[in-house]
Each structure stands twice: as C-alpha cells, then as structure tokens.
Amino acid sequence: MPSSKLLKERIESIQDTMKITNAMYLISSSKLRKARKNYQNVSPYFNRMRDTISRVVPHLPEEPVHPFFHERDTANPKRAYIVLTADKGMAGAYNQNIIKFLKENADENDRFYVIGQTGYRALYHKDPRLVEDFHYGATEPTLQRARDITVDAIDDFKSGKLDEIYLIYTRIENALTSEPTMVRLLPLDRAHLQPAPKGLGDPKGEVEMFPSAWTVFEQIAPIYMHGMIFGAMTESFCAEQSARMTAMDSATKNANDMIRELQLEYNRTRQGSITQEITEIIGGASAVQTSDY
C-alpha cells in the first residue's frame, strides 16, 4: 500500500492538472462564444451573396460555359482537398476524425491542402499528397485568411493545375454532435445555385445586369466561394472548441473521481498509521507498567 506521503503528493498533482483542464474548458467556452458571434455578424452578408448569385446563374449563357462551371472531361482529374484541422490537440477525436475522413475519400494522386498545425504535422513527411508550401493556421478564423485561400484555389483551378477542389471540414450537427463533411468548391454546381422563392424584400420582375450577367457573375462568384470557406473555417473552429470543452470537462470529472478515491485511500492509510501508533503507545505503556511491578 502506498504511503500517506505518496498519496498526498498524487492528490496534489491531480489537483494541479484539474486546474489546467478547468481553465482550458473556460478558455474554449469563451472562444466558442466569440467565434459564433463573429460568424453571426457576417453570415447575413454571405447568405445574401448566395441569393444574389443564384439569381444571376439563370441569366448566364449555356455556351460558352463559364470556367467556374466547367466539368473537365478527364479520366484522372487533378483533385485537391482543402482540409480544416486544428492548431492544437486535446480536443478529443476532433483531428483524428477529420484526417481519417480525408484518407477514406481521397485517391492516390490527389493533393492535400491542410489548414491547421495538427493536421499538417500529422501528414508532414508521412504522406506525399500533402502540399507542404500551403501553410495556414486555424485559430480564430479571419475574413482575410479565407480570402487568401480562395484566391489560391481559384488561381490553381483557372490555370489548369487542378480540375476539382473539395472542402473538408467539421460540421456541427447539434449541440453535442459534429461530423466531418465534404463539399465541392470548384467547379460550381448549377443545380445547387437555383434561386429561392422571392420574399417580401426581394425585387419584383426581371433584374437587369450591367454590363452583363457574365461580368456580374465574375465579380460575385469569388465572394460566394470566400463565404463558403470562411463559413467552413468558423464552423470547424466552433466544433473544435466544443470538442475541447467536452474533453476537458470529462478530464476534470475524471480527475475529481480519482481525487475522491485517493482521498479515501489516504484516509484509510492515515487511519491505519494512527491506529498503529496508538497501539504501539499502549503497548509501550503496558510494558513500562509491567516492569514497575
């Protein structure tokens, strides 16, 4: 049985760890609220942009096909995945799930554009599909970072370096569940850009576009994709913080359980040592009394 001194040291060590896990829980909770507020502030703009682009698409000519819609006829398309992971660990299975999902869906010749230090390190020098000079952080998503990634993706697609670009991120299903998901960024799918029924605030009748629908589409399509990436980055960041909160809450509860068990063991050990000391004192006193007679 461990000594009372050793048990006390273990209890103090676990208490120190519990302070850290509890602090990380509070930090993640604060970051989650901030990220959600940030997304709520900008999402109306991007939602309106999606509505706008869906009203422009029907006015585009069938021929020639706009490059953003062009499905390249090739047996082996040059495919890339923009993958959103976290910069830090200690978030349960968050990073492992997204990497596993990526490998299950990717082919041998695909390319991985990984956002987040944890995912980058997991594939660096281990998977030749990783594009090593593509290096962006995932902490606290910003519009500028999403814009830079969008520009890189569009340039690679237009130049023919890539034929298809997919976005893999963690989607929040509900307050307790999040799952990896994949959406195609380029080429765009006309079927997913159909106009919604007009609401009270929408213009009536036909909308004229100057100088042309093609030119308008050229201007707003990158903003639409920018919104897709920023939304995915923000949702993934929220999912990461939620996963870390769950992991840290579980760790704190486990630490409490361990402390409770160790405290009982410490009390039993301490009680045993006190009982032994009392027994020795009584035995010594009895021996002294016997020697006096």
Regions found by a protein language model. Give the residues of each.
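C-terminal beta-strand-loop-alpha-helix "lid" module of Rossmann-like NAD(P)-dependent dehydrogenases
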Residues: 1-293
